[in-house]
């Protein structure tokens, strides 16, 4: 039983690539044809590549690994958050803060600050502070929550990244590569698939297409976690 059907991919518009003038020649092997100035992605390869990515993610989760879901473009923000939360993983869906991986210690410091501010709000500290001070602290907390909320409980570097549009998330790609963290990504016809360990050729601009593929990666995590629990109960 394959992870995904051609019918599902077609219905979600995964086959629509970018305009022919906006392409990366390295994507040529994944292009089926050109229609009305738009490249059409070869969905048979999408099925195959998604299966490879699924197996990788499932195995990783089974071994207790973590995945960081990354997608900051409008079309990806909701899916990235929803699917990462559904499978109990971490996410970045606002802005990728430079150094999120390569300067993780500093980022952990900012997360610590976020936790402190939340505690102050909960334990009544805000009630005894001057109003002006509280407004300032609340603003700081909201900003930190916006950018770091999805990685608040990420205690160590992730085992892998799942990225929607690695061209847009070039900094995340560069950081992961420098730390040799494997990358799974949806690669559209304007991306460089050679930078990605598990490229999944597909439309990264349609909400439905992004949701479909992201949900499959989350399913792989869930299936892997069930395997991990099963293995633990067998011991």
Swiss-Prot record:
Q: Does the entry feature the keyword Ribosomal protein, yes or no?
A: yes
Which superkingdom, per the lineage? Answer: Bacteria
Name the InterPro entries on file: Ribosomal_uS2, Ribosomal_uS2_bac/mit/plastid, Ribosomal_uS2_CS, Ribosomal_uS2_flav_dom_sf
Record keyword Ribosomal protein present = yes
Q: Which GO terms describe its cellular component?
A: cytosolic small ribosomal subunit
- A GO molecular function held by the record: structural constituent of ribosome
For this UniProt record, give its keywords in alphabetical order, as a comma-separated list.
Ribonucleoprotein, Ribosomal protein
Q: Which GO terms describe its biological process?
A: translation
Family label? Belongs to the universal ribosomal protein uS2 family.
Q: Which NCBIfam families match?
A: rpsB_bact (TIGR01011)
Instruction: Output this protein's name.
Output: Small ribosomal subunit protein uS2
Q: Which gene encodes it?
A: rpsB
